[in-house]
Amino acid sequence: MKYYLAIDIGASSGRHIIGYLKNGGIQSEEVYRFRNGMIRKDGHLVWDMQHILYEVIRGIKEAFKKYPVIESLSIDTWGVDYVLMHGEKEIWPCFGYRDERTDDDINEVWKIIPFTELYTRTGCQFQKFNTIYQLYDDKQHGRLEEADDFLMIPEYLIYKLTGQRVREYTNATTTGLLNLETGGYDHYIIEKLGLPSGLFPKLDQPKMNVGCLSEEVAKEVNGNLNVVLCATHDTGSAVEGIEMEDDELYLSSGTWSLLGVKLKEGIADNDSMMNNYTNEGGIGYIRYQKNIMGMWVINELKKELCPEKSFDEIVKMAEQSSYNGLVDVNLPAFLSPSSMKKVFDDILGEHLETGDYFRCAYRSLAGCYAKTVEEIEHNTKREYHKLYIVGGGAKNHYLNRLTEEMSGKKVIALPIESSAIGNIKVQMEVEYEL
């Protein structure tokens, strides 16, 4: 039996998951987990990449303890963020997407290239933290003067494990710098913004064999294996992990909720732009989807209002509430507030009981999902009948029920580590086991 290691890192935790083929299906076992999160340093929200790398290596070592022979590993993470490099040296810090540094850069970028033109060329939604705005901020503050490379988070981790540099396609589609038609970097945009063209080489595709662990890392983890490219953007891997048809929708429900469909070609028309849809790369298809604030809202309310309670207890409180107020969870105020409760209070104009906050949040999320389904059907001129939900949110029966009621679609919850399954699936395809 062959074993594969998926390293799936999200904004709040990282997981090392062993996968293998049994009875015609992919079986998985978590062998290591660690906490993740941005830290505040010098007034900015940043990622502690040294700590993340330490945990990645520690998890590989734990995997080898239990499974001495592993065929390969692959890494998927969140998108948009990156590490600037000068030769072999990192240019710190590694800013996190919730940092506010790009607030003053967005209009400056749009003065150079109007957003309508950006969207038509890239098909990439507006998010204030998209890589395009982060790199422009780096340029404005002189951080690109010594940079000769930038590596997205999974690419940086692969580099530290193997010594090899790759630039993977699916994650690059989150940058706002790729041309939707060509699938490569749009050098017209890059030149107009004055970004160094040398930072943007040809992209690598999933299923590429990168190579083995470096001698130093192999010695530290007591083993060696191949490193391959999966869809390194975690949502790309999550969608790969769902067995679905073309007339079905997916919802990757975690810190963010990403609701969309698989298309042969992207859509960058005015309706898509006005409703902030994005076209992200999949393996042989485009993921036409919308980013919704997601379980971040629930987690922040829990942290503030009742950290001692379990999520089951929170759901019970929400079910017992009769409050019917709703909020637009996609408002910028929800992105990185000092108090999530205060955001609700300010929007609703009243203070609520604890259970009411959660009922409002869950119903607002479900309502946003339903509205998004309607928009997708309108924009793609197709009707969809099933909605597959994967990720941590798939375990929330209350939110799933609300989503089914409000959307009118059959909800199929798959409480699996879908990103890890998709990650492992690609590794198996590289080994010709699938």
Regions found by a protein language model. Name each.
Residues M1-P93, E146, A218-V227, R401, ...:
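N-terminal glycine/serine-rich phosphate-binding loop of ATP-dependent small-molecule kinases
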Residues L5-A6, I18, W110-T122, Y136-D148, ...:
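Active-site core segments that coordinate phosphate-bearing ligands/cofactors
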Residues D42-L45, F115-Q125, L199:
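Short glycine/proline- and acidic residue-enriched helix-loop micro-motifs
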Residues K65-Y97, Q125-F129, I158-N179, K202-Q205:
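Short beta-strand-loop/turn "lid" adjacent to the catalytic site in phosphate-handling enzymes
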Residues V69-T77, D149, K202, N379-G392:
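Short glycine-rich phosphate-binding loop at a beta-alpha junction
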Residues D76-D81, P206-K207, S253-W256, K386-A394:
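Glycine-rich beta-strand-to-loop/alpha-helix junction loops that act as flexible
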Residues G96-I112:
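Short alpha-helix plus adjacent loop in nuclease-associated cores
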